[in-house]
Amino acid sequence: MEKQIGILTAGGDCPGLNAAIRGIGKTAVSHGMQVIGFKDGFRGLMENRYVRLDNGHLSGILAQGGTLLGTSRDKPHKMLLGGNTVDMTNVIAENYHSHHLDVLVCLGGGGTAKNAYKLHQKGLNVITLPKTIDNDIFGTDVSFGFDTALHIAVEAIDRLHSTAHSHHRIIVVEIMGHRAGWLALGAGVAGGADAILIPEIPYDINVVAESILSRSRRGKRFSIVAIAEGAVSKEFAEKRNTLENELDKEKEKAKRNRLKRELKDLEVQHAGNTLKLSQELEKLTGLESRLTILGHLQRGGTPSAADRLLATRLGTACVDSIREGIFGVMIAARGDHSKPVPLDKVVNKLKLVPSDHPWVLSARDLGTSFGD
């Protein structure tokens, strides 16, 4: 009997999703399997909106950005319906079985892996592929989407150098990365940023300002500051760590809820932090400062050759796992090879930048400030 494969893309879009869909689909079809694509993530599976994917659908999509299936951030166990949040896991399981699926392949980041793992615990066969421009998925060397976003961020820094130099300005460039700084770090090093601020290394703004003034005294009348959106000051990091530690220790529900609210309020206070940092640097240095937020530019456009290669090989390796009956795994990139990693080793973890990572050490050797 032909195997039936379901595919969906969930979470934020990024370059390489279509390449991965193509890699899975064409390989599966070549082995006589049927492929169903569910539209708009887990919501499409819940609403039973789908398209049968054949070579006609999969032709010509390798170089396209985005995802032909559409995506959403809906969670099976927390689906927004009519203004209410409803657990639709059972409906999703029913639709899975109604299509006689042998496996559901979920392309997404850490949140998608977590949602897929919950479905696996309910008895569904699932496989995930690591997709995120943040490159923060635990268990894989790299995620597709990262390389393309890195190229976009580096090109932006290259372009900003000329205007910063011409006007003798500080230019602060906000780069995506909420809890991990891989993208800002890579772009900062490759783009020659003078300061790089990432979530893993809390900064002191006075140290950043002094590094800029030191450049100015040496005749360098401009500076580029590459900052991850989730970079925080030492003061903020201390407050957050205190609350998180208290939450971990607290058993009483009411107190836990209070601590969760305090953490949420603290994160709200952090919104707009990059603009505040840019303004504060202007005050501390006396140099004109401008902020550029790259935002969703980093998610769009044609995937790089590296992302096409990565997404394709992870897609074909996914079908190998399906044929071997290996489920409940993420297909990880390990060097030049692919490896199925159990989802329980992946979920609720982040791949963070270690303080001794070669990119960090090289940047420090070059005199780049991390604000610490």
Predicted regions: what is each one?
Residues N95, V103-G108, A116-K118, F146-A164, ...:
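Accessory alpha-helical/coil subdomains and C-terminal extensions
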Residues G32, F38-K39, L119-S143, L150, ...:
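Short, acidic/small-residue loops that bind anionic groups at enzyme active sites
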Residues H161, S216, V319-I326:
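Short, hydrophobic alpha-helical segments
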Residues A20-I24, G110-L124, A184:
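Short Gly/Thr/Asp-enriched flexible loops that form oxyanion-binding sites at enzyme active sites
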Residues L8-T9, F38-K39, G70, C106-G108, ...:
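Short beta-strand segments
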Residues L8-L17, M176, D307:
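Short, glycine-rich nucleotide/cofactor-binding loops
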